[in-house]
Amino acid sequence: MPHSYPALSAEQKKELSDIALRIVAPGKGILAADESVGSMAKRLSQIGVENTEENRRLYRQVLFSADDRVKKCIGGVIFFHETLYQKDDNGVPFVRTIQEKGILVGIKVDKGVVPLAGTDGETTTQGLDGLLERCAQYKKDGADFAKWRCVLKISDRTPSALAILENANVLARYASICQQNGIVPIVEPEILPDGDHDLKRCQFVTEKVLAAVYKALSDHHVYLEGTLLKPNMVTPGHACPIKYSPEEIAMATVTALRRTVPPAVPGVTFLSGGQSEEEASLNLNAINRCSLPRPWALTFSYGRALQASALSAWRGQRDNAGAATEEFIKRAEMNGLAAQGKYEGSGDGGAAAQSLYVANHAY
């Protein structure tokens, strides 16, 4: 086998590794605030608010105006392109607001899922064209990490070998391009919770998908110490009649990761996948209490599971902004504890216990 040319210098590797470690420092995770305009339409319609650029800005301001309490539990915030260039009411760019708290800025760079021909309704993700130039610009504009989401689903015939391979290679190409531009890639192969499959089936599929992803990352000479993984937790399908405990979910999840994710990866930042806010916190907590050795930081990269209570409290009213921000801070602190295995549960019925599941979820 020919020797691979060193794609990254020692300085580039150190920068990437330092960024990744900062994001997943003990007790810290990621706020995923990278919903597309279409996804924001769904969120805002739930509270009867029109999906305008100004309303999206006002909502993001609710999250980003959180005080210094979030510094200890949020290591990074993922922005959508529009948000990266928006400002708060005082004319301060959101990027600067976040950076001044010592939190790193990330950017969603994929362009959404598209059908994968020759499969049973499976998809790949587009956005590689022009990615090199976009990454260079985003780095100049303050982004230190990026996110790219691929989607797989479980059914009798899926995921197919073709879909697994194609999505693994797309993620690897994206990761390589990011690293060349000093941006840490978050690799997100999401296995949707749609279906009635049990925990074992999800664990089996998760292992096959992650094994393919890390083979592709190796083939593309991606520097693992300068990456993060954003997987689904191993959970039963949403329509599965069997209910599993957080401890069972934790054991299946950590087992799948131990079989597939190299210890060189600094951190695993789970997506919430339509779990309720409380469920996502309890499961993350159980994962961090799991008796199996865990060489990576195991933390959160939550969107809906950090925002649902805040969105309900805000309802598009300026007068509610302060209360909504408090709801977000409260949830962020709870997940910061869960990322250390120190969360005891909120006992919260209400909004925090509401399922956030969306069938066939697209961003």
From Swiss-Prot:
<feature type="modified residue" description="Phosphoserine">
    <location>
        <position position="45"/>
    </location>
</feature>
<dbReference type="GO" id="GO:0005829">
    <property type="term" value="C:cytosol"/>
</dbReference>
<keyword id="KW-0597">Phosphoprotein</keyword>
<feature type="modified residue" description="N6-acetyllysine">
    <location>
        <position position="111"/>
    </location>
</feature>
<dbReference type="InterPro" id="IPR029768">
    <property type="entry name" value="Aldolase_I_AS"/>
</dbReference>
<dbReference type="GO" id="GO:0099524">
    <property type="term" value="C:postsynaptic cytosol"/>
</dbReference>
<dbReference type="InterPro" id="IPR013785">
    <property type="entry name" value="Aldolase_TIM"/>
</dbReference>
<feature type="site" description="Necessary for preference for fructose 1,6-bisphosphate over fructose 1-phosphate">
    <location>
        <position position="363"/>
    </location>
</feature>
<keyword id="KW-0007">Acetylation</keyword>
<dbReference type="GO" id="GO:0042802">
    <property type="term" value="F:identical protein binding"/>
</dbReference>
<dbReference type="GO" id="GO:0030388">
    <property type="term" value="P:fructose 1,6-bisphosphate metabolic process"/>
</dbReference>
<keyword id="KW-0324">Glycolysis</keyword>
<dbReference type="InterPro" id="IPR000741">
    <property type="entry name" value="FBA_I"/>
</dbReference>
<dbReference type="GO" id="GO:0001666">
    <property type="term" value="P:response to hypoxia"/>
</dbReference>
<protein>
    <recommendedName>
        <fullName>Fructose-bisphosphate aldolase C</fullName>
        <ecNumber>4.1.2.13</ecNumber>
    </recommendedName>
</protein>
<comment type="similarity">
    <text>Belongs to the class I fructose-bisphosphate aldolase family.</text>
</comment>
<comment type="pathway">
    <text>Carbohydrate degradation; glycolysis; D-glyceraldehyde 3-phosphate and glycerone phosphate from D-glucose: step 4/4.</text>
</comment>
<comment type="subunit">
    <text>Homotetramer. Interacts with ATP6V1E1.</text>
</comment>
<feature type="modified residue" description="Phosphotyrosine">
    <location>
        <position position="5"/>
    </location>
</feature>
<dbReference type="GO" id="GO:0030424">
    <property type="term" value="C:axon"/>
</dbReference>
<dbReference type="Pfam" id="PF00274">
    <property type="entry name" value="Glycolytic"/>
</dbReference>
<dbReference type="GO" id="GO:0044877">
    <property type="term" value="F:protein-containing complex binding"/>
</dbReference>
<dbReference type="GO" id="GO:0004332">
    <property type="term" value="F:fructose-bisphosphate aldolase activity"/>
</dbReference>
<feature type="modified residue" description="Phosphoserine">
    <location>
        <position position="39"/>
    </location>
</feature>
<feature type="modified residue" description="Phosphoserine">
    <location>
        <position position="36"/>
    </location>
</feature>
<dbReference type="GO" id="GO:0008092">
    <property type="term" value="F:cytoskeletal protein binding"/>
</dbReference>
<feature type="active site" description="Schiff-base intermediate with dihydroxyacetone-P">
    <location>
        <position position="230"/>
    </location>
</feature>
<feature type="active site" description="Proton acceptor">
    <location>
        <position position="188"/>
    </location>
</feature>
<keyword id="KW-0704">Schiff base</keyword>
<dbReference type="GO" id="GO:0006094">
    <property type="term" value="P:gluconeogenesis"/>
</dbReference>
<dbReference type="GO" id="GO:0031100">
    <property type="term" value="P:animal organ regeneration"/>
</dbReference>
<feature type="binding site">
    <location>
        <position position="147"/>
    </location>
    <ligand>
        <name>substrate</name>
    </ligand>
</feature>
<feature type="binding site">
    <location>
        <position position="56"/>
    </location>
    <ligand>
        <name>substrate</name>
    </ligand>
</feature>
<dbReference type="GO" id="GO:0030855">
    <property type="term" value="P:epithelial cell differentiation"/>
</dbReference>
<dbReference type="GO" id="GO:0006096">
    <property type="term" value="P:glycolytic process"/>
</dbReference>
<keyword id="KW-0456">Lyase</keyword>
